């Protein structure tokens, strides 16, 4: 691999990291560290499996299917596969992750701007999402290019300064079971929804790699770049999980959706806390824009078969998003938890099956109990 290819590989790894790294995802390692305390290593082990390893394995599995979402899910059968794909993009879009992003934006800003009304804020956020999703806008890309590095830099600063100035008194978990903390981390990783996102990020990633001259070496390129992206994601999650453990005595009574803003204020001060809050807010906004646009595009092409235009679907999507945002972050998370606990194991099994069993002879044949038994 020459110098240019090495640079390309690193750049691609950073790009994949940026795609998976959402501002909202920082909430979950913080919440985990606050719960597991001195058992944080066990919690992290489970969390990293479902929040880091599985999304990148999902990306590799999708890569074997050339990013063809419908073909990937068709292993379950044509109708069940399309139904599951629709459920996944719905949870990522207006029925889950997108309104959760808006609710988190509101919660983070509320620490610096108390009394900010959720309904008015949600209407404004949905209006902005419509403007930026209605037609491709360079501002969205600019926000992504500028805010993602800024957010990562600020979060790294919080981690470093947080470790340097961490309080001497730490709490110990009242639950001595390592297994229960591992399981908590495993299920908390579901909340990042990154495995779900991997299926719909893959076509974007693969389209950027299409180069006939590199096809023979593409597998190694993607694997190395994925390892780079996964390693960066893991380091950030580990840092914030341990920060929440170290600062747990000062975070008592703070809701999960306000943990990031609260810890930023404690470590960097109130003024820096506002900067972090605004940065995270815009980062969440760009994530919500991408998710809603992906949902509307999927419904238009795969469900409605172009019979209904993009704009009406986008408007309906945002009306649903607004309605669910009013439930607030905690309630949205409580609704998503049981759904993710059912979906994730199925998607993990489907991912491994597609990763190790794809063949040109049976790509379109759905999984049967006999095939599944042979695979296991």
Regions found by a protein language model. Name each.
Residues 11-14, 18-20, 48, 84-87, ...:
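Transmembrane alpha-helical segments of multi-pass small-molecule transport proteins
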Residues 11-21, 90, 159-168, 175-243, ...:
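Hydrophobic, membrane-embedded alpha-helices of multi-pass small-molecule transporters
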Residues 31, 65, 80-113, 281-301, ...:
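Hydrophobic transmembrane alpha-helices that form the core helical bundles
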Residues 53, 57-58, 150-161, 224-248, ...:
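Selective recognition of specific alpha-helical transmembrane segments in multi-pass small-molecule
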Residues 69-76, 235-285, 301, 329, ...:
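TM-loop-TM module centered on a large, flexible mid-protein loop between adjacent transmembrane helices
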Residues 2, 37, 65-93, 110-118, ...:
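Transmembrane-helix boundary/entry motifs in multi-pass membrane transporters
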Residues 5-16, 41, 78-91, 120-124, ...:
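Select transmembrane alpha-helical segments in multipass membrane proteins
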Residues 94, 98, 152-177, 195-196, ...:
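Hydrophobic alpha-helical segments and their helix-loop junctions in multi-pass secondary transporters
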């Amino acid at each position: 691999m020459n110098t240019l290819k090495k640079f390309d590989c690193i750049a691609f790894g950073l790009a994949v990291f940026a795609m998976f790294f959402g501002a909202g995802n920082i909430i979950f390692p913080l919440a985990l560290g606050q719960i597991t305390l001195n058992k944080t290593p066990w919690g992290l082990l489970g969390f990293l499996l479902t929040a880091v390893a599985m999304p990148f394995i999902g990306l590799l599995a999708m890569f074997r299917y050339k990013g063809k979402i419908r073909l990937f899910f068709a292993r379950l059968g044509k109708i069940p596969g399309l139904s599951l794909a629709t459920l996944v993009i719905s949870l990522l879009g207006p029925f889950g992750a997108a309104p959760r992003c808006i609710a988190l934006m509101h919660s983070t800003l509320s620490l610096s701007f108390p009394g900010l009304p959720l309904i008015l804020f949600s209407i404004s956020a949905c209006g902005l999402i419509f403007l930026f999703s209605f037609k491709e806008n360079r501002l969205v890309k600019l926000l992504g290019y500028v805010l993602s590095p800024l957010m990562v830099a600020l979060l790294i600063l919080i981690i470093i300064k947080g470790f340097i100035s961490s309080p001497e008194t730490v709490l110990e978990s009242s639950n001595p079971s390592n297994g229960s903390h591992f399981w908590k981390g495993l299920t908390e990783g579901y909340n990042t929804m990154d495995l779900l996102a991997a299926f719909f990020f893959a076509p974007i990633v693969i389209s950027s790699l299409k180069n006939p001259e590199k096809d023979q070496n593409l597998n190694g390129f993607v694997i190395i770049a994925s390892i780079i992206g996964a390693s960066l994601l893991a380091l950030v999650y580990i840092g914030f999980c341990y920060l929440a453990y170290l600062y747990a005595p000062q975070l008592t009574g703070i809701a999960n959706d306000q943990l990031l803003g609260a810890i930023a204020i404690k470590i960097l001060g109130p003024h820096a806390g506002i900067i972090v809050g605004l940065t995270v807010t815009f980062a969440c906004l760009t994530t919500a824009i991408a998710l809603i646009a992906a949902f509307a595009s999927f419904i238009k092409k795969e469900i409605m078969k172009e019979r209904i235009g993009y704009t009406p679907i986008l408007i309906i999507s945002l009306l649903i998003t607004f309605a669910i945002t009013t439930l607030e972050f905690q309630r949205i998370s409580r609704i998503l938890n049981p759904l993710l606990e059912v979906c994730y194991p199925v998607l993990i099994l489907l991912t491994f099956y597609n990763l190790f069993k794809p063949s040109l002879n049976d790509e379109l044949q759905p999984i049967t109990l006999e095939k599944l038994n042979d695979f296991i």
